[in-house]
Amino acid sequence: MAIADNCKDLLEVDLTKCSISSQSISLFWKKGINTREVRIGQCALIDDSAFPQSTNNQSLSNYHYSITNQPTIKHFEVLRYIDLTSCTLITDEAIKRIITHAPKVRNLVLAKCSNLTDVAVKHISKLGKALHSLHLGHVANITDESIIVLARMCTRIRYIDLACCPNLTDSSIIEISRNMPKLKRIGLVRVNNISDISIISLCDRYNQLERIHLSYCEKITVDAIHVLVSRLQKLTHLSLSGIPDFRRPELQKFCRPPPKEFSDHQRQVFCVFSGKGIHDLRNFMVEEYERKKRSIFFEDYSPTSINNGNDHDYLFNSSNNNANDLLQRISSSPSRSINDSSFGNLLDENDVRRGRHNRLLGALGLSSTSSPTNINSNSDDQLNRRNINTYYNR
């Protein structure tokens, strides 16, 4: 209280882990109008009463308003950073009050504020383009409903952390990808409902994204990460700990070593790529895909009709093309439609089919360089075409 009375020009206040009351914090709202940063994380006694109450006669266009029998409360026009980590007593009402009196906050840390709901996130959305960074990790009650609103209103967010928000789905990540063109970092640790659809949608931000945290998102596959690292050339950090598909030795060799203080279990599931590891992983995945693409045998695919030799590209119908299956699942999603071009070389299905076709023709004595036109005009090729039909029918 003495600090609030005598140090009215404080620019930063850090009371993290202090046994400070809500009454003391409320004094800063009444007197510390020049404060730019406030850190009161892990202050277990702080509740909604720490923040000035809104009234009906309040107007955001005014710099102050009067409350009956209380000192004048002024708007914190210069307040840019608020950290309320683990303030478990605050509710949606506290967030409403903060946003009302500090309408230009850029960085808001609300991790582990377990009582917050979608209502709080919708209040945060009112910050609009002023908001650059938002931490909502372990705020387990929030859903797609509020995150979609946030994504559409706060379009200048550079960093968002949604770790351990179990109710979120692909819908939230798709909206974030579509509406946050400046996004550089995203935390999705243990957001278990997201799938490859979310990962592919993040490729829309290929010019900006630098750090992605996806640990323990067990529905994510290697195919999706292949697309991600191929598209995101600025990516410098990718965490995939706890995802079964990435425990393979051929992928683990590109991971950085786990911290020494980790337990045996943590070391076993640790999978984080950074710096040169990202570059090497990208090269490995591209080379591995090309190798598999070259080694596909026609026995793995069922032939379709020859169509009188006029259809060069539809001799085969893929039955186990993972990349094509991924495209079909994403394209059929009611909330997302992605063009083939988003996948680069990964989904160049025609090349794969043409390669299989040529290998089959070669095995049956027909030149792999023959075009459909040549096949129709050359009698020897016509004979071999009949041999193909015989091969299928025997």
Regions found by a protein language model. Give the residues of each.
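Conserved nucleotide-sugar donor-binding catalytic segment
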Residues: 14
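C-terminal capping region of solenoid repeat domains
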Residues: 6, 23, 27, 31, ...
